[in-house]
């Protein structure tokens, strides 16, 4: 999933003036069919066991720099892990930092040669999370992450994980998006979550989760309230899978936690 910022005015290198996030990609066409088939192969007890016991994910953080541009100190990397652990505690997920790497490569730090970068840096298995912090993702993107797939090839495993704009870590320079919640949002896709809003402006169950009301549009900024589909409940403006400012985001629902557990068991656990 691609997560981007529409720019207002000129942005200095390493500093972004932001208006709103926009998304430039959708889940794989066959994803929901794969998800349903994988779930049907599980016993209900298998997924519920993950909810009860919790999920711990081995996590590798990769910092890409061009000279000093994009460097993230260890303290901010730990702050990012701490933030994700806090955000996902309500969903029964925790992240264990196994290793952090730093690579000075101007090409990779500009978001180019994704395949070459991941082939060189990817660590762990399909159940491991790799996050690549990149200072200059193309077209103002804040993040890109891949949904889990059934029977992943070796190429799919290597290309897995998330690319996140460096300035979105806690204390970063990306205005309105510097509390570490871009990584939280992107990791939601890694764990099988869709956006809470419809991608085509309709009032449908866009995210396949019963306790997130239908929402026909993404949230911009941090409104006091928003109800784009009257009658079904107000929009999930505080949900990590919307597009609100970081300060507005503070919630996963029980239904999302259940989908994460199901997705984990179906696609990633033991792989």
From Swiss-Prot:
PROSITE patterns according to UniProt: ZINC_PROTEASE
Glycosylated sites: 136, 200
Keyword Protease in record: yes
Keywords carried by this UniProt record: Disulfide bond, Glycoprotein, Hydrolase, Metal-binding, Metalloprotease, Protease, Secreted, Signal, Virulence, Zinc
Annotated catalytic residues: 186
Compartments reported by the entry: Secreted
Hydrolase in keyword set: yes
Listed SUPFAM superfamilies: Metalloproteases ('zincins'), catalytic domain
SS bond partners: 222-248
Main location: secreted
EC numbers on record: 3.4.24.-
UniProt-listed GO biological process terms: proteolysis
Function noted in UniProt: Secreted metalloproteinase that allows assimilation of proteinaceous substrates. Plays a pivotal role as a pathogenicity determinant during infections and contributes to the ability of the pathogen to persist within the mammalian host.
Protein name: Extracellular metalloprotease ARB_05317
Organism encoding this protein: Arthroderma benhamiae (strain ATCC MYA-4681 / CBS 112371)
